[in-house]
Amino acid sequence: MKKKGGRKIFGFMVKEEKEENRGSVEFQVFSFTNKIRRLASHLELHKKDFSSERGLRRLLGKRRRLLAYLAKKNRVRYKKLIGQLNIREQ
């Protein structure tokens, strides 16, 4: 283990201390929502871009499944996230 500038390096892995937890359900839903909004605005301009439309549908499905998981595990966090992202409840 080498220490370099406040980071721990294990071979190929660099581990840094960060405030957000990128593996959390909330962060993943937030990330998917940003991608969904970006793709939706792209599809308004390019209506015949069917590969992007397919990607949008995949992202919608992933977000729906993550939200269903969060609603089942912790309803309070689910309601808070829905309110923050301004998306409909399922």
From Swiss-Prot:
<keyword id="KW-0150">Chloroplast</keyword>
<dbReference type="GO" id="GO:0009507">
    <property type="term" value="C:chloroplast"/>
</dbReference>
<dbReference type="Pfam" id="PF00312">
    <property type="entry name" value="Ribosomal_S15"/>
</dbReference>
<comment type="subunit">
    <text>Part of the 30S ribosomal subunit.</text>
</comment>
<keyword id="KW-0689">Ribosomal protein</keyword>
<dbReference type="InterPro" id="IPR009068">
    <property type="entry name" value="uS15_NS1_RNA-bd_sf"/>
</dbReference>
<keyword id="KW-0934">Plastid</keyword>
<dbReference type="GO" id="GO:1990904">
    <property type="term" value="C:ribonucleoprotein complex"/>
</dbReference>
<dbReference type="GO" id="GO:0006412">
    <property type="term" value="P:translation"/>
</dbReference>
<dbReference type="InterPro" id="IPR000589">
    <property type="entry name" value="Ribosomal_uS15"/>
</dbReference>
<keyword id="KW-0687">Ribonucleoprotein</keyword>
<comment type="similarity">
    <text>Belongs to the universal ribosomal protein uS15 family.</text>
</comment>
<dbReference type="GO" id="GO:0005840">
    <property type="term" value="C:ribosome"/>
</dbReference>
<dbReference type="GO" id="GO:0003735">
    <property type="term" value="F:structural constituent of ribosome"/>
</dbReference>
<protein>
    <recommendedName>
        <fullName>Small ribosomal subunit protein uS15c</fullName>
    </recommendedName>
</protein>
<dbReference type="InterPro" id="IPR005290">
    <property type="entry name" value="Ribosomal_uS15_bac-type"/>
</dbReference>
